[in-house]
Amino acid sequence: MTIMRKTHPLMKMVNHAFIDLPTPSNISGWWNFGSLLGLCLIIQIASGLFLAMHYTPDTLTAFSSVTHICRDVNYGWLIRYIHANGASLFFICLYLHIGRGIYYGSYSYVETWNIGIILLLLTMATAFMGYVLPWGQMSFWGATVITNLLSAIPYIGTDLVEWIWGGFSVDKATLNRFFAFHFILPFIIAAMAMVHLLFLHETGSNNPLGIPSDCDKIPFHPYYTTKDFLGIVLLLAFFFTLVLFFPDLLGDPDNYSPANPLNTPPHIKPEWYFLFAYAILRSIPNKLGGVIALLMSILILALLPHIQTAKQRSLMFRPISQFLFWLLVSDVLVLTWIGGQPVEPPFIIIGQIASFLYFAIILILMPIAGIIENKMLKW
């Protein structure tokens, strides 16, 4: 008798993706983040669905409805904090996943990598719109400042901004459409994640050595299901410590004040996971130049497969490139810190140097390091 998981049309798909999938025998814990991102997405969709049952996307009642969720709905405070901190967890896993991809040369799988970049952009858009929904001070002013950046686009900019706002300022129409998009986008992200997996399974997973592993594959289950389960347990332990003991650690106190168009907060800033890009945006005095730099800070990832000069895929045995990689990580952390600081000396010049270094490492120094390493190995 044949096994049902190998013959049933639906179970066969699951079997090929998660059970009998041939997987390299030497992939490390850094490969856990794909499944952890899937878990984060499930947590966000589930908690978001329950929040949407009680939330009202109206400028007069949005803030009150969030207060009502926290005070009157059974475990509403817990659902809200799970959702708010779940976004932070999502981005922590996302950035670690991208970092692993850069370190081990996973960007060589161009289709998978490009779908990943689209997933990153969709997730950033979803998180931004979600931040606007509680209709606190930082929600309102964050929405105003970030959407206003589109006015830098020549000729059509102003019309585009008013079209997105649904009026002449961020108001009820804006909140309504942001809620609609915030609800639908996670399902689009889930569909794109399936496409991401589809392309990945066409080539098979990369491994820390960056060499073909066709001669040494093991089934995904039970080896990597067990390994992923350990990752999930550790992640949830960290997550619920954050949610239950430090729920407001990563939030902004300004968002506990209702939105007031007549009172500008002293320092407008997005959530922590956008601060590095925000710092790059602010470091260029020209508005259009800043918007282009902001976009390029993410889209530069798409260039990685095309500017790789090294003949070794992974950075595991390339000390110069390793140094540059960790310099890049440090630089992104510096940019994150600068993005949260006011626009005044010495933060302005630090931000400009860090922004220049960000692009210089990726576009100039890493390709040069690859050529030097090839020469050192006489390749």
From Swiss-Prot:
The cytochrome bc1 complex contains 11 subunits: 3 respiratory subunits (MT-CYB, CYC1 and UQCRFS1), 2 core proteins (UQCRC1 and UQCRC2) and 6 low-molecular weight proteins (UQCRH/QCR6, UQCRB/QCR7, UQCRQ/QCR8, UQCR10/QCR9, UQCR11/QCR10 and a cleavage product of UQCRFS1). This cytochrome bc1 complex then forms a dimer. Pfam families: Cytochrom_B_C, Cytochrome_B. The chain crosses the membrane at residues 33-53, 77-98, 113-133, 178-198, 226-246, 288-308, 320-340, 347-367. Keywords: Electron transport, Heme, Iron, Membrane, Metal-binding, Mitochondrion, Mitochondrion inner membrane, Respiratory chain, Transmembrane, Transmembrane helix, Transport, Ubiquinone. Heme b b562 binds at H83, H182. InterPro entries: Cyt_b/b6_C, Cyt_b/b6_C_sf, Cyt_b/b6_N, Cytb/b6-like_sf, Cytochrome_b, Cytochrome_b_C_euk/bac, Cytochrome_b_N_euk/bac, Di-haem_cyt_TM. One of its GO terms (biological process) is mitochondrial electron transport, ubiquinol to cytochrome c. Component of the ubiquinol-cytochrome c reductase complex (complex III or cytochrome b-c1 complex) that is part of the mitochondrial respiratory chain. The b-c1 complex mediates electron transfer from ubiquinol to cytochrome c. Contributes to the generation of a proton gradient across the mitochondrial membrane that is then used for ATP synthesis. It comes from the Eukaryota. Binds 2 heme b groups non-covalently. A ubiquinone binds at H201. Its cofactor is heme b. GO terms for cellular component: mitochondrial inner membrane; respiratory chain complex III. It is a multi-pass membrane protein. Heme 1 (or BL or b562) is low-potential and absorbs at about 562 nm, and heme 2 (or BH or b566) is high-potential and absorbs at about 566 nm. This is Cytochrome b. PROSITE patterns: CYTB_CTER, CYTB_NTER. Coiled coil: none annotated. Disulfide bonds: none annotated. One of its GO terms (molecular function) is metal ion binding. It is found in: Mitochondrion inner membrane. Belongs to the cytochrome b family. Heme b b566 binds at H97, H196.
